[in-house]
Amino acid sequence: MSQATGESGPPFVGVDLLRIGELDRLARRGWFRQLMYSAPERREAGTLAPSRRREFLAGRFAAKEAVLKALGVGLLAGVPAWQVDIGRTEEGAPLVRLTGAAARRAADIGLDRIAVSISHKEDLVIAVAVGWSAAMPERADTATHQEVAQAFDAVLARTTRARGGVLTKRRALSAD
């Protein structure tokens, strides 16, 4: 979690990066889906073709991890992941809805709003969550979902080229 101060922007940020295949074995297990995903997320996943479902569940998992990091807690550390619901706005962008312990944690640290961006590239998914208080002024130069995705794609392309076309998880996590 990163926290800024003053008017420099939203104060809480969480990021998660993973390979889509990391969840394959677990995502097939009913207990894991119940533990990680909200009922609306499970319903939506059930309507998708298998390859799209795999990508969807990985994206939602990364988004939940990013939101939990922005809340200052880890996965399975007092805030059930299923209480972080990643829905969609009318435009199709990810929409964060918190319930239960997740909503209480946000209130405890003064967060009124949390936004998340999810990007997929080949077998990687990244999610960035940003939380802020309504008392903080919104910045006029806040990046759009598309701008964040384009920036991620540019960093990933540079990192992949620098590694000779091979990007491992360990290297991805340590790349600047």
Describe the function of each predicted region.
Residues 1-176:
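Core catalytic alpha/beta fold that binds nucleotide/phospho-ligands
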